[in-house]
Structure formats: structure tokens, C-alpha cells
Amino acid sequence: MSEQTTFAPSRTDGVEAHKTLRVLLAGPRGFCAGVDRAIRVVEEALRRYGAPVYVRHEIVHNRTVVEGLEAKGAIFVEELDEVPEDGHVVFSAHGVPKAVPAEAQRRNLLYLDATCPLVSKVHREAERHFAGGGPDQRHILMIGHAGHPEVVGTMGQLPPGAVTLINDAEEARTIQPEDPTKLAFITQTTLSVDDTAEIVDILRSRFPLIEGPKREDICYATTNRQEAVKAIAPESDLVIVIGSPNSSNSQRLREVAERSGARRALLVPKLENLDWSVLEGVETLGISAGASAPESLVQEMVTALAGKYTLKIEERIVKEENINFRLPGPLAGEDD
């Protein structure tokens, strides 16, 4: 699906017309349902309980979103010991280890869990394979990136030693599990679809009895955004992915663009971080945004481009999205 528009500032001052720049907008892009839900959790908590509301870790990995919520009264912390005894606290979309809500309960904190439902699905898979540590237990191999909050949260659902992290294909080739016949794998939801498929193929080849998820762990939004970037990359001299450096899915979009034929791909947090010199010689520019980047950042960039170029904009939509996740627990009624 493709829609084309021309966006050109009017010139009546005799100045030479702007150079034409073709802009391919990847679709879908930007916020996913899990991110939208997490932000709504914080906003509704602020409305219901008043400021401050504490949030453990960045609610999503985007500074613009975080700063916007801070302006409304959210306070971001890394650990629960930074939350006062009578505080209200929200857990981020990435999920948390089981010890975190247990500690919140011990301290009688009112907490709201904004973990993305698709991340919670992976948590349930891990617990199913662990099987309570009984005779049906399988050792779990988690495909993901060390230190990412989602990985920390998922591995923290089970006792130490129950899960081994697989960072890349080389680790999949060399791991030596104690019992190769009793294995299962799960994955971080924001990985490269292609990289993960390679790792899964290696694991299945080495360990034919390994069990995997009934449905793909990589979330629909990650998959759709990567497919959209693949659709624009071959025609693009440059692809700009709007997103924060600590956003896993945004980093993967940049990598996908490079691998899919773009001459160059850059991750740019927002307009003020753009080095305009990178556009020299660019005739076709692709633009996408990570799942935690608001559409306002895309429109801000397009507007700035229109001040320097005559734009021919094409929307390349590979998939329509209409998914909505309900708010958790005490806030659930606000969706009705």
C-alpha cells in the first residue's frame, strides 16, 4: 500500500526553488500497543492518585516520553528503595523479576504492573517449561541481549540457574547443556526477526528435542516495523530511524535497514540530534520510528525537512495495526 503527497513550502521571494527530496515513510512505525498501554498506566495513575507517581525504570526507552511524564509528576527510579513507604509505583513495560513485586508487597506499596502483555506471555512460557522444578522441568535457553531490562525481568521469573542466556549465533553453536534432551527456548520480544531465526535454527539442529513457544515470541510490532523498513530500504539512500540508543527495537530497525539495501542507516533520537550534513547527496530518504518513539517526533522531522526541501512523501504501509491492550488491575475499568 502506498500513498503519495507533495509537501512544499510556498516561495514568493524569488529565491531558487528547493531541491526535491523523496521521503518514504515506513508503516507501521512508532508506538505499539504495549508502549501505549504503559504510558496510559502512568497517566491514569497520576490522574487517579495525584503526583508524584514513581516509575521503576524508564516506562519505555524514549527520553521524550519520559520527560513528558516527568513534567506531569512522574518520578523515575531504578530501585524500590527509592520509593517512600506511602508511594505509588508503576513497573515498566519491560517487566520485572518476581522479587520486585514481592518487595513491593512486603513494604505495602501500591504498585501497578505496566509489563507488556506480550512480555508477560514469555514469562508464562518460562514458568511452564520450568514446571515447578519437578521431573518435567526443562532447562531454558533465552535468546536475548545481556542486561536488557526485559531479559533481566524474564530470567528473574525463575530461580538462578534455571535459564541460560544466548546472546548470538556463536553462543548457540557452542553451548553445552547438561541434558540436551530436556531443553526449551524463549526469546526477548524486540530482537531482529532474521537473527533470531538463525539462532533458533542452530538450536533445533543441535538439539532436536528442544521445545519452543507455540507462537512466536518476537512481538507483532517488532515484526511489522522490521518488515516495513525492509520495504523501503532498497530504494533509500539513507534511512533514519527515530528512537533512543537504549531502545532495542529501534537499534534492530537500523540494522535491518542496513542489511536490506539502504546505502546508510542512522538512529536519531529526535530532530535536534540530526546532523543535516548526512543528507548531502541523498535523493530518497526513508524514515521509520521505534516502537517507543511518538509519532510527533516523525512529524517534527518531516516539517523541518519541508523547510529545506520540496518533499515528495510516500507512505509505505505493509500492515495495518488495530491492537489495544486493557489497563491492568485497579485501572482496568478506565478502558470501558
Curated annotation (Swiss-Prot):
Domain of life: Bacteria
Binding residues for dimethylallyl diphosphate: 61, 94, 148, 247-249, 292
EC category: oxidoreductase
Obligatory cofactor(s): [4Fe-4S] cluster
Binding site for [4Fe-4S] cluster: 32, 116, 219
Entry note: cofactor: Binds 1 [4Fe-4S] cluster per subunit.
Keyword Protease found: no
UniProt binding sites for (2E)-4-hydroxy-3-methylbut-2-enyl diphosphate: 61, 94, 148, 189, 247-249, 292
Annotated pathway: Isoprenoid biosynthesis; dimethylallyl diphosphate biosynthesis; dimethylallyl diphosphate from (2E)-4-hydroxy-3-methylbutenyl diphosphate: step 1/1; Isoprenoid biosynthesis; isopentenyl diphosphate biosynthesis via DXP pathway; isopentenyl diphosphate from 1-deoxy-D-xylulose 5-phosphate: step 6/6
One GO MF term attached to the UniProt entry: metal ion binding
InterPro entries membership: LytB/IspH
Short name of one Pfam family: LYTB
Entries under CDD domains matching the protein: lytB_ispH
Residues reported to bind isopentenyl diphosphate: 61, 94, 148, 247-249, 292
Catalytic activity, as annotated: isopentenyl diphosphate + 2 oxidized [2Fe-2S]-[ferredoxin] + H2O = (2E)-4-hydroxy-3-methylbut-2-enyl diphosphate + 2 reduced [2Fe-2S]-[ferredoxin] + 2 H(+); dimethylallyl diphosphate + 2 oxidized [2Fe-2S]-[ferredoxin] + H2O = (2E)-4-hydroxy-3-methylbut-2-enyl diphosphate + 2 reduced [2Fe-2S]-[ferredoxin] + 2 H(+)
Swiss-Prot/TrEMBL keywords: 4Fe-4S, Iron, Iron-sulfur, Isoprene biosynthesis, Metal-binding, Oxidoreductase
Coiled-coil annotated spans: none
Catalytic residues, chain numbering: 150
Family: Belongs to the IspH family.
Function: Catalyzes the conversion of 1-hydroxy-2-methyl-2-(E)-butenyl 4-diphosphate (HMBPP) into a mixture of isopentenyl diphosphate (IPP) and dimethylallyl diphosphate (DMAPP). Acts in the terminal step of the DOXP/MEP pathway for isoprenoid precursor biosynthesis.
Name of the featured protein: 4-hydroxy-3-methylbut-2-enyl diphosphate reductase
Protein's organism: Gluconobacter oxydans (strain 621H)
